[in-house]
């Protein structure tokens, strides 16, 4: 038996595989529990803005409401429309959910706390978020109904439009950090920046990219709303126009998978905002007692702050018209983000502070 554990098959393949599977299962469990409470927080924030209490019956202060909703969805019978393509109809929500979860494989929640610390992590997330459109298009087409199909077409145009702006945001961060590795981007915000230049390196929050790249932070925030079909850009699911959008024919577990994929994608965008612009797991001030707090706590607080901004947009901003949405993406954000790429590159080059 000891000889087996010394074999290259065990040390080089089986053991790393077991560790990776265990890490993935742990991340999945933690992420799904976090999504349950993020969904509850979304409803509570919306209720507070409208001077309501929100969910408050299931468990103390409504803390178990999301788990009751899960049970309700699972116990319902899934109904497939008679004219629908059954295989594609059932595959669509699975594709949407799995792709959203796969993005978390490269997101570091603390120093060395990441499943796959690849050097192109930010491009991997960008690619995965682009692929998630296929789940929506498949669901809209397979439903064999005009409302889901129209919503799927809207979604395709909307996500393509705002991915361009997010791409330019990524380029500006790449220029400042000198790496596409998400952990390296966080570390770059620890060792260089405005606080370092003025001789106060312990003021870590001044090193974060939200300050020098503030216009791009705003572009990223608004583009994240559009990319994840959140209000005021929820034209894909506009209740007053398309009933429930591409999900109108779905119920039971398939509908739950679509909703889960949507909220995981929102959480991914919040995590990206925390990593790219707010220093990831870094404390705002690198002095006691702030640096005594575990990095994963700081990361979680920043993620929830980003989600709070997204939830408030749902509560206070009216929905855009479709032409306004397209005009904002192509005529405002695209020129602005392109100009910022040129400005950031020029400043870094001529000031002599470009990363080596």
From Swiss-Prot:
Membrane topology qualifier: Multi-pass membrane protein
GO MF assignments = NADH dehydrogenase activity; oxidoreductase activity, acting on NAD(P)H, quinone or similar compound as acceptor; quinone binding
Q: Which reaction does it catalyse?
A: a quinone + NADH + 5 H(+)(in) = a quinol + NAD(+) + 4 H(+)(out)
EC number in record: 7.1.1.-
Principal location listed in the UniProt entry: membrane
Q: Where in the cell is it found?
A: Cell inner membrane
Q: Name one GO biological process term.
A: aerobic respiration
Query: Which stretches are transmembrane?
Result: 18-38, 87-107, 120-140, 166-186, 202-222, 257-277, 292-312, 333-353
**UniProt key word tRNA-binding:** no
Entry's Gene Ontology cellular component terms: plasma membrane
What this protein is reported to do is described as: NDH-1 shuttles electrons from NADH, via FMN and iron-sulfur (Fe-S) centers, to quinones in the respiratory chain. The immediate electron acceptor for the enzyme in this species is believed to be ubiquinone. Couples the redox reaction to proton translocation (for every two electrons transferred, four hydrogen ions are translocated across the cytoplasmic membrane), and thus conserves the redox energy in a proton gradient. This subunit may bind ubiquinone.
The similarity comment for this entry is: Belongs to the complex I subunit 1 family.
How does it associate, per the subunit comment? NDH-1 is composed of 14 different subunits. Subunits NuoA, H, J, K, L, M, N constitute the membrane sector of the complex.
**What is this protein called in UniProt?**
NADH-quinone oxidoreductase subunit H
Organism, by scientific name, is: Nitrobacter winogradskyi (strain ATCC 25391 / DSM 10237 / CIP 104748 / NCIMB 11846 / Nb-255)
This chain is encoded by the gene named nuoH
